[in-house]
Amino acid sequence: SICEYIDAHCTEDITLDEIAKIAGFSKYHFTRLFKQFTNNTFYKYLNQKRIELALTFLADPNISVTEAAMQSGFANPSTFIRVFKAEKGCTPTEFRKMFTG
């Protein structure tokens, strides 16, 4: 399924255009269908998958926040921190302190 594809490739630089093409739909039609079936936008779903992955990296004190961001598929640490805070209500560093505290 498309969700399985996104899950498997979430660390890559995948775009809405690319996924819509793989699914065989226009970007507009894919966006509507994806929202209907997942109750999420494509980018929200993708970011949630990336954050799930980042949580495992953040649990390892040997992996920096920047490294966790890059290994999770985020283009840069600032985007990662912004998305992480929106999803989890705290920064990655704050999360790590709570997790390892």
Predicted regions and their residues:
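Pre-recognition alpha-helix immediately N-terminal to the DNA-recognition helix
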Residues: 1-5, 52-56
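Basic/polar phosphate-binding segments, predominantly the helix-turn-helix DNA-binding elements
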Residues: 5-7, 13-49, 63, 69-94, ...
